[in-house]
Amino acid sequence: MRRSLLFPLATLLMVPAFVSCGGDAIPTAAPEPAKDPAGLLDHLKYLAVRKDFKTAAVITPITPNVVFPGAMNLHNTAKQLGITLTPEEAKGLGLDDAMAARMDSLPGSEIENYKVKDARLAYNAGIYRILKGITAKSWGKMTHMGITDNAAAAQYGLMGVKDMAIGFDGTKVMTVSCVKMPSGAWGITYIRYDVALKNLKQD
């Protein structure tokens, strides 16, 4: 009797920290810092679906040459796609009302009332905002589709940048540009859609 009980218990202990979301796995706890570009995918899934905004800071570099232009471009792209942040999301991402109202008109560099600490928050918010274009079920199906070198990033002072393609159902959906940070973990320098979001079939 005791032996028969031990087996089910052992199998339960071996279940990873993922749950089914329409049949697809999404992390239920914050992933460990990414040791390689592919490790960022779980962070993206977790941030997009679980909305644990603290994880955004784990996967984003903090250098000015990333956060200033990155925040501007991410929010401009999200605006064009019609993706917005709710007041609750903005607050969770550390944006006060005045800052949240500026997301669609950010400068690409530091100005008097927009310093690097502000740009870091805006950049984190931009990452999450871009991810909102994908449904929870689609995130569950999202897979790694290859990694290539991004030589063009060098002209902006970013060395060693990699491009990770991700997608689902055989369709490449996004390119996630990333770089190894001083901590040894990988962080995201930019995200772009490789498909017309309005034409992307999602459940």
Where are these regions (language model features)?
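Bacterial N-terminal signal peptides that target proteins for export
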Residues: 1-9
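Short, low-complexity N-terminal intrinsically disordered segments enriched in polar/charged residues
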Residues: 21-53, 58, 65-72, 76-84
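Short solvent-exposed beta->alpha transition segments
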Residues: 58-152
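Short beta-strand edge/turn micro-motifs at domain boundaries
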Residues: 129-151, 163-203
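Active-site-flanking ligand-binding surface segments in enzyme catalytic domains
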Residues: 155
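Proteolytic processing hotspots in large secreted/extracellular or virion-associated proteins
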Residues: 158-160
